[in-house]
UniProtKB/Swiss-Prot annotation:
This is Anthocyanidin 3-O-glucoside 2''-O-glucosyltransferase. The gene is 3GGT. It comes from the Eukaryota. CDD domains: GT1_Gtf-like. Keywords: Glycosyltransferase, Transferase. It comes from Ipomoea purpurea (Common morning glory). Signal peptide: none annotated. GO terms for biological process: anthocyanin-containing compound biosynthetic process.
Length: 459
C-alpha cells in the first residue's frame, strides 16, 4: 500500500456553498492528477456550473443529489447563492436530510475514502460501512486552531466574549486576537443552531474530531505552526494540499472594462470586491464608496446591491455619483476578478478577505487592503496583516465594528505610498511571498506529500 502507484476511489460531499463546492473541486482536480478516481456528490442542477472546471473528466464523475424540500427553503434552492443569508440554516437542514441517500450511494460506489466538511454525521456513517473519512477545510487551519481548539472546551462552561478575544493557552501565535465586536459574533455562533438541533460550532467541532484525518489547502511556509497545533490538539494526521492558487484564466476581459481601465496610469486604480455572497447594509455600502472616493484615485467596485435595495445604482447618493463621474464605477454583477487583478492599471485590491480572493491577490502585483465582514474572513485578515504583513486592515470601532470613510481612505493610502514604512514593508513581504507561491514545483511537492500521507492513512 506504500507504493506511489497506489490509486483510490474517493467520494466528495462538500457543503452546498459556492466557495466550498469550487474549493473541493480544486482538490478533486489535484487528486485526479495523481491518478485517483473521484465521485463528486453535488445537487443535480448545480452540476452544470462546475463541469467546465473538470480537468480530468475520465477520472472525475458527478453523482447527482436531490436536495430535499424544507419549509421556508425557496423551491429549487440548491446552493447558498439561491437563498438569503439568514436562511442558510435551512439549506443545512436539507443537506442533513440526505443522510440515508448518501449511505446508499457510498455503499454502491464502494469508495475507499470520503472527503466532507459540514456534514458532521458523515464520519460515523463512513465507519459503519468500512471507509475512511477526511475533513477537508476550505478555510485556514489558523481559524480552526483559534476557534475550535479542544483547549477552549470546558464541560458545562459556555464560551464568553472575553474567552474568544484571546487565543487558546498554547496557541503558537498569541498576537492573533479578536476585537470585542468580532468575539461577540464568534460567541453567538457557539449557541446559534445551524441545521436541526445542533449549533454551528458543535457541528464543525464534531466533524473535525470524528474524522480520520484533516486536510487543508495551505502550505507549511505560511501556516506550518498552526497545522502542528491542530495535529497536536485533535490528535489527527494533517494533510496539506498546498496553497489554493487560482488556475490561470483562459478568457479575456470584457472590452468595455479593458477600455475603461486603459484610461488610467499603471498601478493607479483601486479594485474593490466583496465576493458573490457578501451583502452589506446600505449605510456600510455607502461609507465604503465614500472612502474610495476620498482617496482621489480611480476605482472599480464590484459589489452586490445592499440589503433592501434593488440595484447598486439606487443605493448610491446623487452627490457621490457626481463626484465619481469618469473615475469611479460601481458594478452590481459578476466580473472576471482574476483579470482585473492582473490588469496593469490596478494597483490596490480592497477585499472582504475570502480566502480564494486573497489567494488571487497574493499572486498578483496589487497591494491588499483588508476589510473582513464575518467569520473566517476576520481570521484571514489577521493572517495577512499580523502574521504575513502583506496587507493593511481597515480600522473599525472596537465595540461596534463600524468603519468610516476616513479609515478606508487611510488604509488604501498606507499601502499605496511606496515611501512610507508601512508601504515598503507590505510591498516587500508581498513580493517575497508571491515569488515563493509562483514556484513551479510548489504544487507538485505538496501533492506528492499529500498523496503519501493519504496512502498511510488508508493503508
Amino acid at each position: 500500500m506504500g507504493s506511489q502507484a497506489t490509486t483510490y476511489h474517493m467520494a466528495m460531499y462538500p457543503w452546498f456553498g459556492v466557495g466550498h463546492l469550487t474549493g473541493f473541486f480544486r482538490l478533486a482536480n489535484k487528486l485526479a492528477g495523481k491518478g485517483h478516481r473521484i465521485s463528486f456528490l453535488i445537487p443535480k442542477n448545480t452540476q452544470s456550473k462546475l463541469e467546465s472546471f473538470n480537468l480530468h473528466p475520465h477520472l472525475i464523475s458527478f453523482v447527482p443529489i436531490v436536495v430535499p424540500s424544507i419549509p421556508g427553503l425557496p423551491p429549487g434552492a440548491e446552493t447558498t447563492s439561491d437563498v438569503p443569508f439568514p436562511s442558510t440554516h435551512l439549506l443545512m437542514e436539507a443537506m442533513d436530510k440526505t443522510q440515508n441517500d448518501i449511505e446508499i450511494i457510498l455503499k454502491d460506489l464502494k469508495v475507499d475514502v470520503v472527503f466532507y466538511d459540514f456534514t458532521h454525521w458523515l464520519p460515523s456513517l463512513a465507519r459503519k460501512i468500512g471507509i475512511k473519512s477526511v475533513f477537508y477545510s476550505t478555510i485556514s487551519p489558523l481559524m480552526h486552531g483559534y476557534a475550535l481548539s479542544p483547549e477552549r472546551r470546558v464541560v458545562g462552561k459556555q464560551l464568553t466574549e472575553a474567552d474568544m478575544m484571546k487565543a487558546p493557552a498554547s496557541f503558537p501565535d498569541p498576537s492573533i486576537k479578536l476585537h470585542a465586536h468580532e468575539a461577540r459574533g464568534f460567541t453567538a455562533r457557539t449557541v446559534m443552531k445551524f441545521g436541526g438541533d445542533i449549533t454551528f460550532f458543535d457541528r464543525i467541532f464534531t466533524a473535525v474530531s470524528e474524522s480520520d484525518g484533516l486536510a487543508y489547502s495551505t502550505c507549511r511556509e505560511i501556516e506550518g505552526q498552526f497545522c502542528d497545533y491542530i495535529e497536536t490538539q485533535f490528535q489527527k494526521p494533517v494533510l496539506l494540499a498546498g496553497p489554493a492558487l487560482p488556475v490561470p484564466s483562459k478568457s479575456t476581459m470584457e472590452q468595455k472594462w479593458s477600455d475603461w481601465l486603459g484610461k488610467f496610469k499603471e498601478g493607479s486604480v483601486i479594485y474593490c470586491a466583496f465576493g458573490s455572497e457578501c451583502t452589506l447594509r446600505k449605510d456600510k455600502f455607502q461609507e465604503l464608496l465614500w472612502g474610495l472616493e476620498l482617496t482621489g484615485m480611480p476605482f472599480f467596485a464590484a459589489l452586490k446591491p445592499p440589503f433592501e435595495t434593488e440595484s447598486v445604482e439606487a443605493a448610491i447618493p446623487e452627490e457621490l455619483k457626481e463626484k465619481i463621474q469618469g473615475r469611479g464605477i460601481v458594478h452590481g454583477e459578476w466580473v472576471q476578478q482574476q483579470l482585473f487583478l492582473q490588469h496593469p492599471s490596478v494597483g490596490c485590491f480592497v477585499s472582504h478577505c475570502g480566502w480564494a480572493s486573497l489567494s488571487e491577490a497574493l499572486v498578483n502585483d496589487c497591494q491588499i487592503v483588508l476589510l473582513p465582514q464575518v467569520g473566517d474572513q476576520i481570521i484571514n485578515a489577521r493572517i495577512m496583516s499580523v502574521s504575513l504583513k502583506v496587507g493593511v486592515e481597515v480600522e473599525k470601532g472596537e465595540e461596534d465594528g463600524v468603519f468610516s470613510r476616513e479609515s478606508v481612505c487611510k488604509a488604501v493610502k498606507a499601502v499605496m505610498d511606496e515611501k512610507s514604512e508601512i508601504g515598503r514593508e507590505v510591498r516587500g513581504n508581498h513580493d517575497k511571498l508571491r515569488g515563493f507561491l509562483m514556484n513551479a514545483d510548489l504544487d507538485s511537492k505538496y501533492m506528492d506529500s499529500f498523496n503519501q500521507k493519504l496512502q498511510d492513512l488508508l493503508g
